[in-house]
Amino acid sequence: MTGEKEKVPAKHGWIHDNPYLLLALAALFWSGNHIVGRAIGGEVPPIGISTVRWLLPTIALGLFAFPHIKSDWPVIRTHWGILLWLGIVGGALFTAGQYIGLQYTTALNVSVLNSLVPVLIIATGGIIFHDRVTPVQLCGILISSIGVLVIIAQGQLSNLQHLRFNWGDIIIVSNMMVFAVYAVYLRKRPPMHWMSFIFVFGAVSALTTLPFMLWEMAAGITFKPTWLTVFAVVYVCIFPSVLAFAAWNRGVQLIGANRSGPFVHLVPLYTAIFGSVLLNEHLSTFHIFGFALIIAGV
């Protein structure tokens, strides 16, 4: 017994009970967040966007999901400790670290460091919960990691020698470790409606980062009101926040953190596709080969 998966409730619907689709969608929404985060660098403060990213969805969920929150309130009161922990780690720390890191490092480096997530999840689960890893899982991680490196190296191994890392990369690596901790602790999430969980998760995250956002504002670091920043706020409030975390949480609930980890490798795949479609970046043969390896490993 690894304790990796929590007990799964009765079926609710095809999408809700399809972990692979849910995890692929979570990676899709997070890849869009990377593009938006890079596009608005310098336009919005990192802590400010982290706070708004959870504050606005929490307010909206508080209005639309009130019956679920009311019904789940006894569970929330009983399990407030783990809910507080998940909100601080997975919401406040991970989100803020992501935007801070994007201020100082390149998309290429982020793609390299993202490939650490599946390994970090396995290592963290082994250390904290003594999880066991199957040979198939290790093989899948290895194959998808090679696919990521093929894309990053543009098909030439020598290109990896020219990668340069900075202290922003240290932030990203630390952030990947934070996400791994969040992923393995999801098994402790109490049984409650997904809207109730996201409401509490978002409220904890927003309240944790709010004082730092106020400090940013006092220091004169504020949002620059443009159509780009408005679009960015709308996007990050809906897709990489509510929808991505709801999909990821459910996927981990269904198949466990270790098997979910390799889906993070889809993020650079999606990012490359978005770059080709939206930014007219050229798709090469090495992209296709790398994509095939990523899909095979996942």
Regions found by a protein language model. Name each.
Residues 2, 42-93, 120-121, 177-182, ...:
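Transmembrane alpha-helices of multi-pass small-molecule transport proteins
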Residues 50-52, 91, 95, 109-116, ...:
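Helix-helix packing/entry segments at the starts of transmembrane helices
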Residues 61, 84, 124, 133-155, ...:
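Hydrophobic transmembrane alpha-helices of multi-pass small-molecule transport proteins
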Residues 40, 49, 53, 101, ...:
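Hydrophobic/aromatic residues within transmembrane alpha-helices
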Residues 2-51, 88, 161-188, 208:
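Glycine-/small-residue-enriched transmembrane alpha-helix faces in small-molecule transporters
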Residues 29, 33-34, 62-114, 150, ...:
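Specific transmembrane alpha-helical segments of multi-pass solute transporters/efflux pumps
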Residues 35, 61, 121-123, 127, ...:
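Transmembrane alpha-helical segments that form core, pore/gating elements
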Residues 36-39, 43, 57-76, 146-162, ...:
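Membrane-interface helix-cap regions at the ends of transmembrane helices
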